[in-house]
Amino acid sequence: CLAERYSSDILIELPEVDAIVGTGDYDKIAEVIREAFKGEKPVICGHNDRTPDERLPRILSTPSYTAYLKIADGCDNNCTYCAIPMIRGHFRSRKIEDIVEEAENLAKNGVKELILIAQDTSRYGKDLYGEYSLDKLLEKLVTVDGIKWIRVHYFYPEAITDSLIDTMAKYDKICNYIDMPVQHGNNEILRRMARRTTQEQMVERINKIREKMPDCTIRTSIIVGFPGETEEQFNDLYEFVKKVRFDRMGAFTYSQEEDTPAADFPNQVDEEIKEERLDRLMTLQQGISLELNKAKLGKTLEVLVEGYDCLLYTSDAAD
């Protein structure tokens, strides 16, 4: 992303850089390396609306038993704090058959867990097929021999359909795990963030998920100190987190991202206030997570063994 956004600046500030490749051109890496070895300084960027051929052979950067599987790239949500649409381009889904083919190849090489990723997985297929199609993709992926678990990251609340929830609840292969960044819980802040849901709509979706998948782990991300956030609005967020009881939460103080609308919003919040609010929110969440973790004591869970160091095994559970 750094290369895509600041390619010209990088060559000036870091003259020791040999080559620059943007987000839409990583399939050209062999060509770029050959040019770099010749002493040239190739810069291949500006094609962030292009979808590289994902069927190219790949080397896993993860342990051999797990693999990330990209199902789409780019984002059309245009949240006011976020630069991703500028860097990654418009939302573009891969074809179902291409994704399944890659999953089959990964399984043949010993992969047991697939982690589906995109900037917005829940919107998968809307551009290709005219409707949200993540449920249809999952129906195909569960048939891939050798795959034990399928985990999905980065849902947007408004695109989590009843059909998707039903599909996730139906198959044991699909982990009961929802990674759903909500970003805030106050409706006015959500509106100024250009988010597409209200607090009430998010609560309704979360309740539906827990109704269909009682053991589902829900993780979220939240921004504290968005421009103009008042103490009352933060308290609204605090009570929202207290009510919903996320299993896991990552919270961050707002930072001004260059060229985004929110960077120029008035009433930027002081850093000390942001940090104090973050501490309060994370203290609340730590207590919630501890209670929810204690509720698992005495239960037997199926895990994927990740390692052994003569003292203990390390592992990852489906939730």
Predicted regions located by residue number:
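Proteins enriched for Cys/Gly/acidic motifs involved in redox and nucleic-acid/cofactor modification
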Residues: L2-Y124, S163, I178, Q201-E211, ...
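Conserved SAM/AdoMet-binding glycine-rich loop
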Residues: R5, K108-E231
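Short, hinge-like loop/turn segments at secondary-structure boundaries
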Residues: F37-G39, Y132-L134, M168-A169, L237, ...
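Radical SAM enzyme [4Fe-4S]-AdoMet core and its adjacent flexible, acidic
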Residues: G125-V142, G146, R192-R196, Q256-G287
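Hydrophobic, well-ordered secondary-structure elements that form the walls
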Residues: M180, S221, V241, M249, ...
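Structural detector for short beta-strands of small beta-barrel domains
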Residues: L297-D309
